[in-house]
Amino acid sequence: MDAPRIIIVGAGHAGCEAALAAARMGLRVWLYTLNVDTIGLMPCNPSIGGLGKGHLVKEIDALGGEMGRAADASCIQYKTLGTRKGPAVQGSRMQCDRLEYSLAMRDAVERESCLSVRQEMVDGLLVRRGRCVGVKERSGYEVGADAVILATGTFLDGVIHVGSVSYPAGRAGEFPAKHLAKQLRDLGLPAGRFKTGTPPRARGASVDFQAMEEDAGDAVIKPFSLRTREIRRPVRSCFRTYTSRRTHELVRHNLMKSPLYSGEIIGTPARYCPSLEDKIARFPERQRHPVVVEPEGLHTSEVYLKGLGNSLPADLQIELVRSVPGLEEAEIVRPAYAIEYDYVDPSCLRVTLETKQIKGLYLAGQVNGTSGYEEAAAQGLWAGINAAHAILGKEPFILDRSDSYMGVMVDDLVTRGVTEPYRMSTSRAEYRLLLREDNAADRLLSKGHDLGLIPEDVCHRHDERRREREELCSRLEAVRIRPCADVNHVVVSRGGSEITEALTGTRFLKRPEVSASDLVTLGLLPEGIDSDLARAIEIEVKYEGYIDRQRREVDRFRNLERIQLPDDFDFDIVPGLSRELRERLKAVRPASLGQASRVPGITPAALTAVMVSLKR
């Protein structure tokens, strides 16, 4: 293998995206993994996307990432979530075949000519004069590189807990990275401990699906990737059941057998993915909690018991699972477990995800205190692009909070740090009406093309689609709809009032009871129009006022973002700042006045003082 320019440690969702991005930009990359058979592994839930997370997948795809394509290639169920809410918060979710997803990602990795995979434990970093210049393998072999990206997931000093039993592991059946974790602490990177976990898996043949509610997903599967024309695959249903009174009694009577409550686990758990013990202890008034039985794939009967994540003893887990209706005879294939691991506080990172203390060292994924496949993949892509740009002498690749959910996430991480596992949600984005799933390509595809990660033909197809949308919107604005029986029948049948004067097609569509499908019925939009195109037109027209308002807010936001703060700006000379606020600003080292405004604790008066000092 040729010597690498970039080394990536870890071949999970972050590592794969980082490696693929850098290799596709023409740099020689080595991707380290403990086991080549676990490249792109889904170690927890067999799904991609969700509220907020689906937005990330679409953005990753628009920038040339691989996650959306791998999900499309392994999809066994599709759902649009949040359909009762507005378009800004709706998200796509795919149930995936766990094995096929991993194989699709491995195939993508192995097809890249500039990318080499190495099955080996990385025991340490080579750091010389404040710069990371390579890695040291467990064998003692040293490999030099211009940049190193750590995408180590839960492997840094990982410890698995099942009841009173605990043992070192990065994942079930895999060794942890103890030496690397110690070195990061010795290098002065601010480290902490988080806790996550995974539910039990059961043998599908032992589950009584007839006793559960079937969830068959949506009839039409919409691809995540612009590069997927259509998805024609076998589909599988999920099934819903609920915990019982017996389930709750078992947990309450055995709470101290959980390391989460006995004091053995010190790591902070994820707020939005609580264990069963947490749900029952924190919400005693709840009579039941949902349990979703999800298929693991087409080639196995194994099912994932979403909602039953716990760290109770293995023998107690059998009784616990069998207390749930439909699981009375269930055979556990893999018990649930909790895992503690080291993370690095991301406030020590630059916006590029390079560490401030050590040049050439980038961190991506769960090592930065995040939770979730999609969050990890987005960071991996971001770090891979920026490491490549640094080596090639190009400007950093930065998206801001008004560009993308990726920009929101990275800004949150590096500006505010984390005190619990960070999970993306639509509520984190101030400009979410502008950052919808359906316009991810409008926002980011040209950037992906400029990076060399999106082919010309993909851009051409999207440009044609955008021109068609603009032409149809212009046609609606030009057409006049006059009161008549056909029009008023549509309006009244939807619960609206008759129109009494001529309206443009645009004003007619703005009425809450009118949809794009009604315009097709009336001949105002072409019959057979693509449903996604019709939906995009409807959103643009109905939400025009709100969208314009958010665009004005973005203009004000960008005015502050344009005011850059030098790397060596002296916050000690700013009058009126408290000592605590000075320390926070010096720790974060905001790159702009806009970023400074989001540092926890900063007030409008403090921001004005910084601005005045900057002008001096």
Residue ranges and their predicted role:
Residues 428, 436, 445-602, 606, ...:
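Extended, charge-enriched "interface" segments that sit outside catalytic cores
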Residues 20-128, 139, 151-171, 175-180, ...:
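Conserved N-terminal/central alpha/beta ligand/cofactor-binding core
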Residues 376-397:
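Internal hydrophobic alpha-helix adjacent to the cofactor/substrate pocket in enzyme cavities
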Residues 138-147:
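Core beta-strand elements of the Rossmann-like FAD/NAD(P) dinucleotide-binding domain
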Residues 35, 182-318, 326, 415-488, ...:
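An anion/pyrophosphate-binding glycine-rich loop and adjacent beta-alpha core
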Residues 304-370, 398-411, 530-584, 589:
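A glycine-rich dinucleotide-binding beta-alpha-beta segment and adjacent secondary-structure elements
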Residues 147, 152-156, 312, 325:
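Glycine-/small-residue-rich beta->alpha transition segments that form the dinucleotide
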Residues 2-14:
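Beta1/beta-strand and adjacent pyrophosphate-binding region of the FAD-binding site
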